[in-house]
């Protein structure tokens, strides 16, 4: 009888405690500090800066040129946050078609690493706010130190004479000849189309400089200037075999810092991830690399038995990705974001910077709404399945849903949301 009473009391106690425990662990303690978040497009960073200073914008989700916020007077009325995580790269079209494509030759693509002056990009174009890159791993990436020996083994330095030598040798092997200073193949002058982002001053300058380098080697360069919308049509939306483009100046952002990055190598180098020329459209020519696919899939699904094996896989994938040179990384950048002085609670996350999903959740304003300026509002596929392929729409999308887990803004460890 005593035992029955004991168990009855225990069960009743659990029934009393359980609801309060469930309520405590299932619901957030409080909501956000604002009731509404507005996103407004501002293409011009200088205009956006003044709007933030005047209080018409609370935050601007795009970098502001360092020379605009150098002095104490320049920073009156605003807060400035610095963040790493963004980068620049050059996408190369390696397709094979009826028209001769010089970039279908792997060794020729690899030579482009000597044609780009990475130090010039960092020191001059972005004013020292960045570092040179040769792979998708920047110096602040969690895995950078474990693969630094692999990266340094390439010994890349700006050497246009060496690039010219390699490119010339490969073109001659392919049957091309130089006539009056320009390369020809089968009696036709070789023309390359460089799609250059005109809406980004840095990428525009990179494209202009590299175009001159290619012209010095003997290529006829057609410069096609355009913005994000045009890039999605011409570069990412066309059949690479049609050769509407050969080179493209890319820019990358980050949604956060990952302590164990399982996606980066697949995203930047591997065909299976659908982010390489052709994008796995069955009606297009597609870049293929079974070796890279095999390695990056193992990293993606954690198919390794130790940290040492994981590092080995990362080294192999990095070496192959850089050697193939379909996507050539140029520089990482330190972005400077501006916020109005009256806004508190900004989260400057590692990798993502101020545009992290945690900023709108935590930001405090004297008003019920938070007004955020963005560089672009791309009207693409707002679809969580194979959509949101640009950083601008992702900055909005990541505030519209709660994933099961997300990387901690300061440690990179996965935390439950």
Explain the meaning of each model-derived region.
Residues 104-212, 216, 288, 316, ...:
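Append "and occasionally in soluble cytosolic enzymes with long acidic Gly/Pro-rich linkers
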Residues 37-39, 96-102, 108-111, 148-156, ...:
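Second-shell loop/turn segments in exported
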Residues 46-57, 107, 208-217, 230-245:
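Short helices/loops that flank or line small-molecule/ion binding pockets
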Residues 110, 122-127, 222-232, 261-340:
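Extracytoplasmic/peripheral linker and loop segments enriched in polar/acidic and small residues
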Residues 78, 82-86, 232-298, 385-390, ...:
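Acidic-aromatic pocket-rim loops
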Residues 29-40, 188-194, 212-231, 295-298:
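A local structural motif
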Residues 7-9, 14-56, 106, 110, ...:
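The feature preferentially marks the first beta-strand/turn patch immediately downstream
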Residues 38-96, 119, 124, 250-255, ...:
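Extracellular/periplasmic solute-recognition and catalytic clefts
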